[in-house]
UniProtKB/Swiss-Prot annotation:
Active site positions, chain numbering: K162
Cellular compartments annotated: Cytoplasm
Region ranges (Hexapeptide repeat domain): 245-360
Keywords attached to this entry: Cytoplasm, GTP-binding, Magnesium, Metal-binding, Nucleotide-binding, Nucleotidyltransferase, Transferase
Gene transcribed to yield this protein: Gmppb
Organism: Mus musculus (Mouse)
Name of protein: Mannose-1-phosphate guanylyltransferase catalytic subunit beta
Length: 360
């Protein structure tokens, strides 16, 4: 079985992290976002993953080719010369996707959840129509594509992209199974699968919804990235508690790479992820943060709701909070306060940032 993952976007919502690394390769809980998806697909029996690539495609290709042998699957690249939306990439990869008559997965690359891929396959085969969409319930459906479907069968009657008035609280979770017949509906041009393809399929009775059980998050922007981390760590607590870290000063759900080092008298957690090579000196307090590979947090600093990029250096007695995001290789000097700062890569910060703003 095959899967197509849409990884061609610029990742603008997750800047400044995506200025130096394509979004699918940004580490989420110590593993690239894309790898969470690919490993789950491989575990469900997918043997060929196609990546619809554009921005920083060489970095993506290099990283995923290295994973091919480890996972025992085939990984192909489908290169977009121009942005093709969310349906155009299917037409571009038509030859690969239609090599067999089997249905195939399509995934948005921003999504993290428990990935019920085997259950999706069973659901799709049971109803026998052209398309299956994974849906989830949210409190603010107006930001998403909303699905109106039959409660017992899942047959979708309407598919409304970002409705202005309340239609339903079930939204498109960004994961589909489609039969090859769907490819005949899509032309090789910029096309939205949500606005142009799914509404027609729903009208013809060819689209069904399966409701996701468990957590779900679109982690495409920093505040949602941190919320997704909290949900993921709680899921680990329930299913794989042995993967979480415990020890002096550890509070709640904390994930620590074995190569990270934590000093004395620290308070780490709840909801913290420390990546490979991270150094946390004595007396540091970190809550609800992701600290990426080779970052260094010096003594007595206090971080809450932050993303610290690769190889950053945070000085002594620094306070950072309110979804402060440091791009790659940022230096924050001693005794500064950063409130909601978004700092571009390779910057050195010499004065406090008391109000949320972008540091260029």
């Amino acid at each position: 079985m095959k899967a197509l993952i849409l990884v061609g976007g610029y990742g603008t919502r997750l800047r400044p992290l995506t200025l130096s690394t394509p979004k699918p390769l940004v580490d989420f809980c110590n593993k690239p976002i894309l790898l969470h998806q690919v490993e789950a697909l491989a575990a469900a029996g997918v043997d060929h993953v196609i990546l619809a690539v554009s921005y920083m495609s060489q970095m993506l290709e290099k990283e995923m080719k290295a994973q091919e042998q480890r996972l025992g699957i085939r990984i192909s690249m489908s290169h977009e010369e121009e942005p093709l939306g969310t349906a155009g990439p299917l037409a571009l990869a038509r030859d690969l996707l239609s090599e067999t008559a089997d249905p195939f997965f399509v995934l948005n690359s921003d999504v993290i959840c428990d990935f019920p891929f085997q259950a999706m396959v069973q659901f799709h085969r049971h109803h026998g129509q052209e398309g299956s969409i994974l849906v989830t319930k949210v409190e603010e459906p107006s930001k998403y594509g909303v699905v109106v479907c039959e409660a017992d069968t899942g047959r979708i009657h309407r598919f409304v992209e970002k409705p202005q008035v309340f239609v339903s609280n079930k939204i498109n979770a960004g994961m589909y199974i489609l039969s090859p017949a769907v490819l005949q509906r899509i032309q090789l041009k910029p096309t939205s699968i949500e606005k142009e393809i799914f509404p027609v399929m729903a009208k013809e009775g060819q689209l069904y919804a399966m409701e996701l059980q468990g957590f779900w998050m679109d982690i495409g922007q920093p505040k949602d990235f941190l919320t997704g981390m909290c949900l993921f760590l709680q899921s680990l607590r329930q299913k794989h508690p042995e993967r979480l870290y415990s020890g002096p000063g550890i509070v709640g759900n904390v994930l620590v790479d074995p190569s990270a080092r934590i000093g004395q008298n620290c308070s780490i957690g709840p909801n913290v992820s420390l990546g490979p090579g991270v150094v946390v000196e004595d007396g540091v307090c970190i809550r609800r943060c992701t600290v990426l590979r080779d970052a260094h947090i010096r003594s007595h600093s206090w971080l809450e709701s932050c993303i610290v990029g690769w190889r950053c250096r945070v000085g002594q007695w620094v306070r950072m909070e309110n979804v402060t995001v440091l791009g790659e290789d940022v230096i924050v000097n001693d005794e500064l306060y950063l409130n909601g700062a978004s700092v571009l890569p390779h910057k050195s910060i010499g004065e406090s940032v008391p109000e949320p703003r972008i540091i260029m």
